[in-house]
């Protein structure tokens, strides 16, 4: 490594944001350096060993559509795959993979080490070099100055990180890793708007001390789903089940009796925790009427005995953790291998960023991941690919890019952050997107891969595969719109049809019937339809069956725009508005916005919530 070399882009941090940022910049052909405090922990899953879920799976598919690493790594490391919301509409269906931590790190490292234009170096960063309002490089822990034309910071929970277990606290970026204290101070000296957030993790348990007979087994799906558009089920390692258990009233009693020892409830922690991933202490206090809470018992990998009990994140003292864990069904003899803990860390107000994730104060300095106030691997990776790409585009003097809200969940994520900011760790949900019928998991490639190719992100293998898929969809749709299903075909479909056809119709129209799928149409020899892979026939079916819903949603969006200046009465009690989440009610009652437009700029108040407000105003005969 030549210390005098000028890198185009330096990425600081080797987590989920940093790895995607470094790969994206390198794919665009610029000289990229990835700095990490530990090469062995590139792509480390610091908390739960899982990828995807509601809203999050959509982000993973979009990252994959732009030729990112996360979906491919999840396929190579996933030890259980499930489609969540499988019985619901395609807009909210989401893929989730339980992952082997070791295999995931290995898959990410393999992609990094095989990427052209990318150098990896193990060094923590203590400072940025700033000259003339621009960043010119970084200073490492051992005093090396590394020069760059752009820098991407993806430092996770390491900035000013402080770990809490009971009343004990110590500096740390995560358990076993040092924090970035010097870099945190350097960034604060730049007068960037800074705050503190908190997250936590549960104790880990030795599988051999668990009685699984008291639990409900949760197998994966068959056939086994895949994450990457280039993936197949043969990419997956051995598949294993998860299990479900529950806390008991004894669990709750122990936690209630020890709340004074919780750093959260004793006022020791200043940072705000994630609303949608509360600690077990929070659950007991906030949902005092519940006699039990569900726990997902998840394996950490194929070569470890450690189990991740998803649902009991805690910062209570270790001896209290042992007590309450052993009151949970199946955990009566549990041996804790690692204590649960809370960690608080610095983040910077994302309203100080452009939509390209560059800081407004220093235009060649980019932020991605938890430094922007988000929580979750997927949210971090989504920001990473955008920040790394835009850092490279800036170097190449090309126009920067970020998807719009109607193009991608990545666009929703970034727009929410830079427009509204966040005072609590931001997690993606499908409910945050007003265009969710357009932004499905199944069509992320159709939405983004062509743009990714234009930008230089998408390689030849993905582009060739995508082009063939798109051609198959378009040519088959043309056939369906120009072919007819006749009334006399009623006999052919009599076992499937809920109601017989009354008149001839185009095949595309016939496919809109809920009981009819593409396989039924293949029964008609005169249509000459091709045999196609499931992912293509599924896309064709969805495009036809949901065409009317998508059109209606677009009309709703237009209507909503017309009502942006609708005034909201000061006396309006948002508890009376049917359908609003507790988060939205809480924020609206506290802020009391004067108009629908102002309400829409409040973090967490989605366009769907604005529609509910509009309906309430009309029903209440309040002026609209």
From Swiss-Prot:
The gene is mnmG. This is tRNA uridine 5-carboxymethylaminomethyl modification enzyme MnmG. Its cofactor is FAD. InterPro entries: FAD/NAD-bd_sf (IPR036188), GIDA_C_N (IPR049312), MnmG (IPR004416), MnmG-rel (IPR002218), MnmG-rel_CS (IPR020595), MnmG_C (IPR026904), MnmG_C_subdom (IPR047001), MnmG_C_subdom_sf (IPR044920). GO terms for molecular function: flavin adenine dinucleotide binding. It is found in: Cytoplasm. FAD binds at residues 13-18, 125, 180, 370. Belongs to the MnmG family. Homodimer. Heterotetramer of two MnmE and two MnmG subunits. The keyword Oxidoreductase does not apply. Transmembrane segments: none annotated. NAD(+) binds at residues 273-287.
């Amino acid at each position: 490594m030549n210390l005098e070399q000028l890198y185009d882009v330096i990425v600081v941090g080797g987590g989920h944001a940093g790895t995607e940022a470094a790969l994206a910049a390198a794919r665009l052909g610029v000289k990229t350096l990835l700095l990490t405090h530990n090469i062995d922990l590139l792509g480390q899953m610091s908390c739960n060993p899982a990828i995807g879920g509601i809203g999050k799976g959509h982000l993973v598919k979009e990252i994959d559509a732009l030729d990112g690493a996360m979906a491919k790594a999840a396929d190579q490391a996933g030890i259980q795959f499930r489609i969540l919301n499988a019985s619901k509409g395609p807009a909210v269906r989401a893929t989730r993979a339980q992952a082997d931590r070791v295999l995931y790190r290995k898959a990410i490292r393999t992609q990094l080490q095989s990427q052209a234009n990318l150098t990896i170096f193990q060094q923590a960063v203590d400072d940025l070099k700033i000259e003339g309002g621009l960043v010119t490089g970084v200073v490492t822990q051992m005093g090396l100055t590394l020069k760059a034309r752009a820098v991407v910071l993806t430092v996770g929970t390491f900035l000013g990180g402080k770990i809490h277990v009971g009343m004990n606290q110590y500096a740390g970026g995560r358990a076993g890793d040092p924090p970035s204290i010097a870099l945190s101070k350097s960034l604060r000296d730049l007068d960037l708007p800074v705050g503190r957030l908190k997250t936590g993790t549960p104790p880990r348990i030795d599988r051999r001390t668990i009685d699984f007979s008291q639990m409900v087994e949760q197998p994966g799906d068959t056939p086994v789903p895949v994450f990457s558009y280039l993936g197949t089920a043969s990419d997956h390692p051995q598949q294993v089940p998860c299990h479900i258990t529950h806390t008991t009233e004894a669990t709750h009693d122990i936690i209630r009796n020890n709340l004074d020892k919780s750093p959260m409830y004793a006022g020791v922690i200043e940072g705000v925790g994630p609303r949608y991933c509360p600690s077990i202490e929070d659950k007991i206090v906030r949902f005092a009427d519940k006699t039990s809470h569900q726990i997902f018992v998840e394996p950490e990998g194929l070569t470890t005995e450690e189990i991740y009990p998803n649902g009991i994140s805690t910062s209570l003292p270790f001896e209290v953790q042992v007590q309450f864990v052993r009151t949970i069904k199946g955990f009566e003899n549990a041996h804790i291998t690692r204590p649960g803990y809370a960690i608080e860390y610095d983040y910077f107000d994302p309203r100080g960023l452009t939509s390209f994730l560059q800081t407004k104060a220093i235009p060649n300095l980019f932020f991605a991941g938890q430094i922007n106030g988000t929580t979750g691997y997927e949210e971090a990776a989504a920001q990473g690919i955008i920040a790394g790409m835009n850092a490279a585009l800036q170097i190449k003097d090309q126009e920067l890019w970020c998807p719009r809200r109607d193009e991608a969940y990545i666009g929703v994520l970034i727009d929410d952050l830079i427009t509204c900011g966040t005072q609590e760790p931001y997690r993606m949900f499908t409910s945050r997107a007003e265009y969710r019928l357009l932004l499905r998991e199944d069509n992320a490639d159709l939405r983004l891969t062509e743009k990714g190719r234009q930008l230089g992100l998408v390689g030849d293998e993905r582009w060739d595969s995508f082009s063939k898929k798109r051609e198959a969809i378009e040519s088959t749709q043309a056939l369906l719109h120009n072919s007819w299903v006749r009334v006399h075909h009623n006999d052919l479909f009599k076992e499937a049809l809920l109601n017989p056809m009354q008149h001839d119709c185009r095949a595309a129209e016939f496919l809109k019937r809920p009981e009819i799928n593409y396989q039924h149409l293949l029964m008609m020899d005169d249509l000459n339809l091709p045999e196609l892979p499931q992912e293509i026939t599924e896309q064709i079916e969805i495009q036809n069956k949901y065409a009317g819903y998508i059109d209606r949603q677009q009309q709703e969006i237009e209507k909503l725009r017309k009502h942006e200046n609708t005034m909201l009465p000061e006396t309006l009690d948002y508890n009376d508005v049917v359908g609003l989440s507790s988060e939205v009610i809480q924020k609206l009652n506290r802020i009391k916005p004067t108009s629908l437009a102002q309400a829409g700029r409040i973090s967490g108040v989605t366009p769907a919530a604005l529609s509910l407000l509009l309906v309430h105003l009309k029903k209440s005969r309040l002026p609209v």
